[in-house]
Amino acid sequence: MREFGKSRKLDNVLYDVRGPVVDEAARMEENGTNVLKLNIGNPAPFGFRTPDEVIYDMSRQLTDCEGYSNSKGLFSARKAIMQYAQLKKLPNVTVEDIYTGNGVSELINLSMSALLDNGDEVLVPAPDYPLWTACVTLAGGTAVHYICDEQSEWYPDIEDIKKKITDKTKAIVIINPNNPTGALYPREVLQQIVDVAREHELMIVSDEIYDRLVMDDYEHVSIASLAPDLFCVTFSGLSKSHMIAGYRIGWMVLSGNKALGKDYIEGLNMLSNMRLCSNVPAQSIVQTALGGYQSVGEYIVPGGRIYEQREYVYKALNDIPGISAVKPKAAFYIFPKIDTARFNITNDEQFALDLLREKKILIIHGGGFNWDKPDHFRVVYLPRTEILKDATGKLADFLASYKQK
């Protein structure tokens, strides 16, 4: 009988945030082992709750959400997103430039599928959120990784970006605030990226899902606000800021010189129509979520959970011999560096597996974020401080005698 294998289009597609190490953790859990999951930015399991007003409004509107919406989304949702984009100073945005999706993830896939021909190149940061590289690859393109510099607060290396541009380069992706590093890019760095994009006629694609999770009174600047003459695509959503990752509601905003993307927009509309619409109940709460009280603000100031957990994990990790980390300014991730010579580490995935098996702690190795050296890993600091204290204590104990074989 004929056997059925996976498509060859998936041969070079990786997504290790839910990959082999996570699969091993699942097997351990099936056998009754309690695993502490520091691998994925899912707020709900760690006690973060959706604002009551949002839940109430959804429940009141459920009977009105039984049919399809416009393929781009409900007018009320898109109007609220448009107004939010205007507050962020995105230029030349109308309701028709807004696309809702089942989370930003769906829209990343849609946006790359509409853009890329086989062999086209997209500049993607390293480290990155791996879905970007996966979706570029799946669409037939090539993700060309530019370095973000740990010695410079994990900001993009502008000279490296310039070196990576070829006549096949179509777009540059930035992730700001950044996952996995927690970096926040200042206006000056963003302006340099805009200048490069302008010189080389690149589309700017910006993932800004963590833009409302910025700490220490820093300002988040949308790169599209600096590029009215370029064609920009900006992504955000409610999964992180409103702690509703399971509701699956994100959006994509087109801005700037949209005449440059006229044919591309036709492709976006075609793909948007093909999936009919994003889930309507989640769309129904966008207006309330964006227009109402922003409870996330309580988490990211001194005394707030995310702020205090960041403070703890940053110090605790840096106190472990052989570990160093740059302090995150946003989101809820930290990307520590490990002294590979000290621990004889040549395979970071094996390091993550060894930690999982010995200490029952699940982290994602740096290679899962397209970082090409075996010297980093990502920690999610959503668990309460007492849990993080237990986790960092176990990590310190593990490393006290660890030598990779």
Residue ranges of predicted features:
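N-terminal small-domain helix-loop-helix segment of the aminotransferase-like
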Residues: R2-K6, D11-G103, L110, C277, ...
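A short helix-loop-beta submotif of the ANL/AMP-binding
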Residues: T137-V144
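Active-site phosphate-binding strand-loop segment of PLP-dependent enzymes
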Residues: V144, D149-H220
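Conserved core segment of the aminotransferase class I/II
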Residues: S225-G304, Y314-A316, L399-A400
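Conserved glycine-rich beta-strand-loop-beta hairpin in the small C-terminal domain of fold type I
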Residues: Q287, G303-Y314, A325-D339
